[in-house]
Amino acid sequence: MTVYRRNPTAEEAKARDFAAVSMDLIRWFRISERLAALGHDVDLAVPDAASAWPLNPHREAAALPRVALSQVRWHEYDVVKTLFHRGFEVLEEYGGAQHPFIISKLGSVVASRDIDGVHFYGETRRRLYATQQRIRKASRYVTVLSPSARALWTDCFEASDNTLLVPGGVDAVVPAAGADPYPERGKPRVLFAGNIYNEGSQPEANAVLVSKLNQLGRSLGRRGARLYLLGSGDVSRLDPEHVTYLGAVEYRRSWDYMRHADVGVVVVAGTFSHNNESTKIYHYLRVGLPVVSEAGFPNDNVVTESRLGFVVENGDIEGMAAKVIEAAQRAWDRESAIRYILENHTWEKRVDTYAALLTRHFARRMP
């Protein structure tokens, strides 16, 4: 059983389907699907209202059974896997936190005090840390996104063989190419695809990201290129003169925005991100899109290893814009970068850690 969300959003309730526009949902679906593909029986614990939504063969994780949270019989499952702090809190609320084999996946790991690079502060950070304390007591395993996240967890709760590294990933098989979705052609297209947060979730990060995107858009405009933002978050301070906001689209539609862009960019919500990676790096590279990433993410080495882009000095927006133009003009070996991603950073590769863990503990009952 995999657990994440307590309630659907208003948009999801209206559409009667999960709006797969963010990587948290995609990760939930993809890891669940890949475990099922290995022969395990995997159910999704979904909000009660979502359990009554009509079947849709085109929805994400359509083949996986969905069980209303209030109806889950936790003791009937060998393993319960939660996603992020929220997933564990939902498990607690619905009476499953006493299960003997919980795997808790964390995105950001917070410390017992506010620290640089972890964009949760004050009361929000204290609440998340309290959840981590309960996770440590209840969970058989904890998985994190990066070595720095594992190091911080160890600093907080001591070293353990039960803290595992499972970074983000990307689909091995992507939808067939579709029509160009951009409003116009002419200037080089520079894409930032991702969540920029809002007042309810990491408002400090939102302020920094919007400021950097406005600066980058202005600098790119002087160089004859246009910056586009695709994704969710508070865009009220985004400068439309320099940045075109494309809105948030379903995951399956996002691929064509990446395919028809010239460069994908990554900016950091500060001088560095302590332990939360940038999943967009994997996605840009999956379709052979050159990447220019501001230094500071734990996984920006992927750009260098792929040989399809640049990692630039943090805070040097003018230098970043210059590298974007260079990336758009250079002849790259895009197919080599795609092969690198397929060999190292797909969801199939990520689920190997869970598969080995399940084999170790349940070998006699494996399919």
Regions found by a protein language model. Name each.
Residues 305-306, 310-317, 325-331:
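Conserved acidic donor-binding segment of nucleotide-sugar-dependent glycosyltransferases
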Residues 200-207, 252-257, 264-283, 292-301:
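Nucleotide-sugar-dependent
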